[in-house]
Amino acid sequence: METYQNTQGSYGQRAMGGRSMDYTVDMVFCIDATGSMEDTTGSRMKVINMVKQNALNFYSDFDRIMTGKNKKVRQLRVRIVAFRDYLADGADAMMVTDFFMLPQQEREFEACINSIHADGGGDIPEDGLEALAYAIKSKWTTEGAKKRQVIVVWTDAGTHDLGFGASSEHYPKGMPTSHSELNDWWDTMDRNAKRLVLFAPDEMGWSYISQNWDNTVHIPSVAGGGLAEKGYGEILNAIANSV
């Protein structure tokens, strides 16, 4: 496991002699869409509100940070997986989109983000591992010499065991049935390209992944706090540092 503190060194391969490197970047944002993740009244902005507010500027903000690192983003695609709880939320438990090409489709991306309303969730653990499974099985680009396949998870809750919600008629077929099998899925991804950035509490599911998966950065969040303690700049920098 690579830690946040040594992320830049661990991921390495920085530009030499001031010459920028071109990157083809795919990102999947796995967003906990349960009730605690959004707040329209509190003084501290929670993560869904933050993502909504900055969706239209995400490409330009990300590109600016990458340019400062002598890294040129030749292509950026972003996919959304918004997750809740299959037993509690049924058909609304998972929203999975195709990739949005940015900045060309930034208006569609913004509309998608704005359609997410934090609601439901039932008990405190959520079906975040199923969301991660969807992300791993994305149709990643095969173009470009310098590819990055980045999964970012935002949640303030632990996870159910895989298959916890399998009795729901809406539970997807073909999901892994154990941590070991999900780990095998992760191992099939290109090790040079894959990155996992977890904004998640040090609780069920996530702690196992952060301790056992390669190319993983875990920035602990406060359980039940909606990631209100994380600023947009911190989140953006953590994502950029993983590329």
Language model feature labels by segment:
Residues 1-243:
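Acidic, low-complexity intrinsically disordered regions
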